[in-house]
């Protein structure tokens, strides 16, 4: 992970890795993409995802494991992107209101907000989780992006907006998966 200048070793079953270059033992990557079902966390390949799209089935998420800027800077970037025309407003300048699903919602002040932005805050007031969802009617198929850290890595998750209410389960499933992947790498010679 380039920004933090560190590596996190993981070991996952090959079925989760689509690309041949990901199957090389000891390979080092700056990021890794996974695609799984929302309900059972089973891996889904590109062909299967394409077929599901064709049939109107969207019960899946993708997540990228990598390295990004600090969560507070990320929260500011996501908020500004959702609230165009507000200039260089930082996360700390947005008022937060209570929202459903144990989240706080940013009160966007721009003339035409594009997304709703939600947060969970850590003890120090810095966002632990950022969830950004398209506002219905702004795009044909609204989705959500969710950002958090797990096992020393930054995670970006993407799923359809209907799954937003399950954001905690999604985060717990990914956290458990990555925790197992890190632990498995300690038990192997990588």
Description of each model-found segment:
Residues 90-140:
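Signature of long, low-cysteine stretches enriched in small and polar/charged residues
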Residues 135-190:
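Long, compositionally biased interface segments
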């Amino acid at each position: 992970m380039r920004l933090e200048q560190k590596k996190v070793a993981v070991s996952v079953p090959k079925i989760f890795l689509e690309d041949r270059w990901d199957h090389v033992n000891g390979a080092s990557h700056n990021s890794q993409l996974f695609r799984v079902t929302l309900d059972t966390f089973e891996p889904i390949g590109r062909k299967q995802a394409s077929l599901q799209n064709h049939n109107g089935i969207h019960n899946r998420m993708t997540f990228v494991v990598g390295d990004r800027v600090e969560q507070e800077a990320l929260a500011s970037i996501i908020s500004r992107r959702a609230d165009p025309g507000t200039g260089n407003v930082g996360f700390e300048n947005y008022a937060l209101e209570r929202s459903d699903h144990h989240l706080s919602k940013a009160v966007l002040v721009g003339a035409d907000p594009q997304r709703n932005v939600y947060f969970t805050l850590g003890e120090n007031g810095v966002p632990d989780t950022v969830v950004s969802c398209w506002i219905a009617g702004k795009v044909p198929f609204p989705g959500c992006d969710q950002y958090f850290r797990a096992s020393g890595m930054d995670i970006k998750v993407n799923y359809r907006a209907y799954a937003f209410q399950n954001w905690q389960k999604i985060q717990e499933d990914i956290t458990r998966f990555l925790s197992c992947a890190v632990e498995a790498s300690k038990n192997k010679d990588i």
